[in-house]
């Protein structure tokens, strides 16, 4: 089942219109056995599908976001100009681009819709399964030209290659390796989880407002995501350090307002 909402136009001259829509999956069963009566996957598309001589769409590219983001993040001006503008690698005049919000993210079904701690525990396998169903069942695409994924989205792309080896011509995982989460990546996620669970507002997952305690710890986590040589350049002195911390806290606050940092990060860690 599919519903469409108002479309939003990219201002780049001669380019396509980005269309927002929802796909609904009834009685969806997650990998761990839990189920949801109705599950929504929100997505956007950019460009127009091209059909080959057999009537099949042959120019579709799935573009998958990272942890805590959503499909519309990739429709921002910077990504548009770098990737999807005329003459760029994924020119929207040539390709039919699909930007899903993964379960637990953006406008797709997520814990803060009401179930909170009772929301089924989901993992990367569920994300990839829902992406596949969106592509094949909702959009009627039998074969993708490519899959571009960033960070968590890159891990999803690797899983596509394993689960559906004939479903795409190729994958483009960015800042992602086909190995379990470890090292600094594991550490900063654990820090986020601990900061949330130790917050009194967490209330065992039955929060009445999003926990805020993790915001104060985020600058340390943000530092762990950066490289030491780069930090030497951007933080040469005390005032620069203050700016770095303030900007990190602002980033954390922005992520927090988009929803389920609690459930989203936890499930990325524990479930593949």
Describe the residue ranges of each PLM region:
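Short glycine-enriched nucleophile-adjacent loop
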Residues: 154-165
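Conserved acidic catalytic loop of the alpha/beta-hydrolase fold
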Residues: 125-146, 159
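Catalytic nucleophile-loop/oxyanion-hole region of alpha/beta-hydrolase
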Residues: 114-126
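N-terminal cap/lid subdomain of alpha/beta-hydrolase-fold enzymes
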Residues: 44-113
